[in-house]
Structures are given as C-alpha cells and as structure tokens.
C-alpha cells in the first residue's frame, strides 16, 4: 500500500507500507460426542470411527487420529489432530466405548433318566451346560436340587457374562 500526504502548499510525500495477512486461528471442531459400539470380542474389536467435522477460516489440510486398528472391550480415548494450510493445529480427545449388551448363548445338557433308589432322595449325575459369549462368560449356574424326588424335575441353567447379560435354558 502506498500512502501519500499533501500539504496546503501542494507539497507531497509518499511512503510504502507492506501489509501481510496471516492466519493464526486454529481449526475448530463442534459437537464431538463420545461413540459407543457393540463388542464382538474381548480384545480385537474392529471399529470404523467416522471422520469428524472440522471447520477453518482457510483450508484444512489434514485430519488424523491415533485410534488403534483393533479396540479392546471398554473405554479408549483417541486424539484427533486437525491442521490448516497455515500450520495451525487443533487437538481434541474423543471417547470410544466398546460395550457388551448381547446376551450369551447357552445349551442345556441332554435330558437324563435314571432308576429311582427312593421316593425323595435320588442322586442324579448330569453333564454341564455349554455357554459362549462375545466377550467373557462369568458364571454358569443351575437350580438343580442336591437330591431329586421321584418324577420329572426341570433344571434351569443360566449363563451370565462379564457385563451382567444373561441367558437361560432348561433341561
């Protein structure tokens, strides 16, 4: 920019001024929410994290994060880095939760028929139920009595996973 000043006698002088406009404002991210995904395993959950929305008064040249390839069950904090064309950087954290809301599967053992030895105090041996879960089975229980009365007794087996989800099957 050239500045010129003229006095009342018509004398003038000029000076040149250089004005440089620089970007010192970092990009911004709005509404970065925690994300929740269903677990498929204890340690190897393949999760596709959606790209975040960022804006800048110039041009964004990179949006990156440090998310692992495979997520463990539980909470992971990832860091996003947004850089604009002027080198301004904004770093923000995002919480990723991998949860287990799926009930385990359980298969009760086969039915058992034994010869009675008394009317009320029959010992019965039976197999154990089989259960599986996407993450981890905590307990497998049943409501079988210690001794069985004469006749049919329904035994309910229950599998509970580490997140408290449960499923039952009868024998």
PLM regions and their residue ranges:
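Proline-threonine-serine-rich low-complexity tracts
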Residues: 1-171
């Amino acid at each position: 920019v050239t500045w010129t000043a003229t006095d009342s006698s018509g004398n003038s002088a000029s000076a040149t001024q250089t004005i440089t406009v620089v970007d010192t404002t970092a990009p911004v991210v709005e509404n970065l929410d925690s994300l929740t995904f269903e677990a498929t395993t204890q340690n190897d959950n393949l999760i596709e994290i959606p790209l975040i929305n960022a804006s800048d008064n110039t041009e964004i040249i990179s949006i990156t994060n440090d998310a692992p390839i495979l997520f463990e069950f539980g909470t992971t904090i990832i860091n996003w880095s947004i850089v604009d064309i002027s080198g301004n950087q904004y770093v923000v954290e995002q919480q990723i939760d991998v949860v287990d809301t799926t009930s385990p599967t359980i298969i009760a053992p086969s039915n058992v028929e034994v010869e009675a030895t008394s009317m009320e105090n029959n010992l019965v041996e039976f197999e154990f139920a089989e259960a599986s879960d996407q993450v981890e089975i905590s307990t497998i229980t049943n409501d079988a009595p210690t001794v069985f009365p004469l006749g049919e007794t329904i035994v309910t087996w229950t599998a509970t996973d580490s997140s408290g989800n449960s499923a039952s099957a009868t024998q």
